[in-house]
């Protein structure tokens, strides 16, 4: 599972997921899976989508993961009263804004890439779309 090796602080504030996306263009591969909605992806969801894509292309071509879960999410244990400090870090998430390219793929036909991204999109909680690299 993806998570940072080191962080400056163990826990962070909840914050808000606003603003515009960085990394909106397909830059490494030929095809991409772009987020249409706003939300957050857990490390487990990112890995599940990657596995689905890898199996769909039968380990051909190359896949790039363009998102990284760098925000720790804390939870308190079950049946624990409020107070007594912030909970323990349970999982890591990546904040996603509309327009962000989540995955890229190269070295496979377009139909295969579309099918693989469709399987990956089913594992993700946000709406996505298939995009291709635009040459200028």
From Swiss-Prot:
Disulfide bonds: none annotated. Keywords: Ribonucleoprotein, Ribosomal protein, RNA-binding, rRNA-binding, tRNA-binding. GO terms for molecular function: rRNA binding; structural constituent of ribosome; tRNA binding. GO terms for cellular component: cytosolic large ribosomal subunit. It comes from the Bacteria. GO terms for biological process: translation. Signal peptide: none annotated. Pfam families: Ribosomal_L16. PROSITE patterns: RIBOSOMAL_L16_1, RIBOSOMAL_L16_2. Belongs to the universal ribosomal protein uL16 family. Part of the 50S ribosomal subunit. Binds 23S rRNA and is also seen to make contacts with the A and possibly P site tRNAs. This is Large ribosomal subunit protein uL16. It comes from Proteus mirabilis (strain HI4320). The lineage of its organism: Bacteria, Pseudomonadati, Pseudomonadota, Gammaproteobacteria, Enterobacterales. The gene is rplP.
């Amino acid at each position: 599972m993806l998570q940072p090796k080191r962080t400056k602080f163990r826990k962070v504030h909840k914050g808000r997921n606003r603003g515009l996306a960085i990394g909106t263009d397909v830059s490494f591969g030929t095809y991409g899976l772009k987020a249409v909605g706003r939300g957050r992806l857990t490390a487990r969801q990112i890995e599940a989508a990657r596995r689905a894509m890898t199996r769909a292309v039968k380990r051909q071509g190359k896949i790039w993961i363009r998102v990284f879960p760098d925000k720790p999410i804390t939870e308190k244990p079950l049946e624990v009263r409020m107070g007594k400090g912030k909970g323990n870090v349970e999982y890591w998430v990546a904040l996603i804004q509309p327009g962000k390219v989540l995955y890229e793929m190269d070295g496979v036909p377009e139909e295969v890439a579309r099918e693989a991204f469709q399987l990956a999109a089913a594992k993700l909680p946000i709406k996505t779309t298939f995009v291709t690299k635009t040459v200028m």
